[in-house]
């Protein structure tokens, strides 16, 4: 069984993740992925600390573009080189749209569970 950090913004979009949490957990468990759940908060030091755990196989971010970007930035800053799955559950979800991740949560979860990956360029803007 694989283990993933599931980092979500409970306020993004129409608050889909908190309402669908049981179904999300079930879909990942059906694919032998155990989720360690973390909510985005004012102090995210526990999330960043958890990213360094040796028993973590992947990181999953669920939220809008801000949440997806914040998690990616933490990973880059901390030198975390794990697969990063994204569930676009925010208002616009431009990032997930641009890399062809479906809006349908079950389809997006399926892509993550199957290990499909995309290379994405990152940069720094001042």
Q: How would you describe each model-predicted region?
A:
Residues 5, 31, 38-39, 53, ...:
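Catalytic core of DAGKc-family lipid kinases
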Residues 23-33:
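A short, Lys/Arg-enriched amphipathic alpha-helix followed by its capping loop at the start of a domain
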Residues 15, 65-68, 90-92, 102:
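Gly/Ser/Thr-rich beta-alpha loop segments that engage phosphate groups in nucleotides
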Residues 18-20, 71-75, 97-99:
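Short amphipathic alpha-helical segments
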